[in-house]
Amino acid sequence: MLGTINTTGMQGFNKSERCPRDTRMTQLLFPVLYTVVFLAGILLNTVALWVFVHIPSNSTFIVYLKNTLVADLIMALMLPFKILSDSHLAPWQLRGFVCTLSSVVFYETMYVGIMMLGLIAFDRFLKIIMPFRKTFVKKTAFAKTVSISVWSLMFFISLPNMILNKEATPSSVKKCASLKSPLGLWWHQVVSHTCQFIFWAVFILMLLFYAVITKKVYNSYRKFRSKDSRHKRLEVKVFIVMAVFFVCFAPLHFVRIPYTYSQTTNKTDCRLENQLFIAKEATLFLATTNICMDPLIYIILCKKFTQKVPCVRWGKARTAGSSEDHHSSQTDNITLA
């Protein structure tokens, strides 16, 4: 096995020497786009942090939202390193730091965020299907334990990617795969497949949860009022969460398997490898925009959050109207808040 790993590692290194990467787009366009996302993400998540500091963690829902916020903030803080590295505005040593540490932390927190969104969907599912049944999964102690487990899992599977690396040189930092030891390349493949499994498992479960939630809400509205604009808006809210999750994360996971394969074998031609690299960078940027989308989810789903944000609270107060609207608004809070 060690012989196979060593051969794979040498292939990855030799390939980086004979297959130079086309970085014109990643050096010019993506750093600008990432800068916009970084500034917007820091602003939105700083406001969200201020709000959540004033909200006690007295429900599983709030616990999951707070963990999502922490993951998003850490992701955002990793972006300046990528921006400086990709734009070649920093010394080559920073590129080595990005490959061995900051990008690893970035991916780690991305998958923490993915699992937290899955737990949020599960929490909504339980509150809609079993609103009055008391069970241990509805206790904050359970939510905190699961959250710690998620962070611990991602930390321990990410740690070898920070350790199993060779000494950085000006030539080896051009491709992160060239920095990895033979065992590090093998572990990178293991982690990549593990993360693929995490994403698709969460996505399928979210799809099932929200399908059941939508059916439950639809049947409830049919029973009491057959045609209601509030009902349609509520359906849109439910599917917006699924849409954001799919649009942000699915493209990256379609691309990541062939990209990782191209990085760890010697069977991909240079043109295809460069195309996969651009596709990976484009879909990674799309996934990064999730740090700006999650604060919108807080506003849509969390009543306590909107009560703490003055501009949102003022806007809702202006739109508050008849008693029928008030009743519908409360129904929305029961189903989504």
From Swiss-Prot:
Glycosylation sites: 6, 14, 266
Domain of life: Eukaryota
CDD domains: 7tmA_P2Y13
Keywords tagged on the record: Cell membrane, Disulfide bond, G-protein coupled receptor, Glycoprotein, Membrane, Receptor, Transducer, Transmembrane, Transmembrane helix
Cell location: Cell membrane
Disulfide bonds: 99-176
Regions of this protein lying in the Cytoplasmic compartment: 53-60, 123-144, 215-237, 303-337
Any one GO molecular function term: G protein-coupled purinergic nucleotide receptor activity
Residue ranges that the UniProt entry lists as topological domain Extracellular: 1-31, 82-101, 166-193, 259-281
TM ranges: 32-52, 61-81, 102-122, 145-165, 194-214, 238-258, 282-302
Pfam families listed in its UniProt record: 7tm_1
InterPro entries per the UniProt record, alphabetical: GPCR_Rhodpsn, GPCR_Rhodpsn_7TM, P2Y13_rcpt
Family membership: Belongs to the G-protein coupled receptor 1 family.
Protein name: P2Y purinoceptor 13
Organism expressing this protein natively: Mus musculus
Lineage: Eukaryota, Metazoa, Chordata, Craniata, Vertebrata
Gene it is expressed from: P2ry13
